[in-house]
């Protein structure tokens, strides 16, 4: 671990608990001063063993968390799924928060007898081409018993299948990240703030990160990994055969805003993603695709006034775990 990793982990654990330094000093039974705590978080000083133990108890986490040995978070994958948009310090802070949150969630799941093991039903599925992407999306829907219609909540679906999803405030250009803990536990980090994203964007981001977690990406492809993940997200949310049926055929002279708004409100798929899918399937001409992007989508990237997916796209697993623990205590 880097030399300042303890400082980052202490700071992020305190922030995750929404504690001021004064409050943490109080919870630690005043065995540490606010001045010392500040020095720990700045990396100027390290606590003695007895103080470390007390801080761990106050923050409800193992001492191994501070050493970075409580679990192995796949940092290279976290770095990859950030798209190179994050500074290393930001990545370390996110990794610390993710490690802290995951350790506490797993402990609560054990206490509530509410744990689920994740199984990748399309493990080692090689995705090189658009055809591979479509097959992978269709197969996953089949194996997860999703049918060929709208998926009401992809976040709740992913949680049910064993993917742990942490909500976090991410930097401006980053909407989601994904990685593995101990090579067996899939993790997603999503920025769910309404000020930053919309329900359809959030669904697309989550499906994109799902592709990173489940699929294998051979280097011998004309498509970048990011493009393959984008296309998987689109076809997972709106399957090829269903899209063609909804559009009334395999070829269209033009797409209308009104029909795509209707489909957006039903399937939770943005206008932009629908136009992309129509082009991927050669349903529309390049000229019509360019017209939609240049004259419409680029001028309204948040798609304001173009319909809203009404179903609440939220996470809920941790809330239910907490409820079961509270019920046990009664």
Sequence positions of predicted segments:
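Active-site hotspot residues in diverse enzymes, especially metal/ion-binding acidic/histidine motifs
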Residues: 1-330
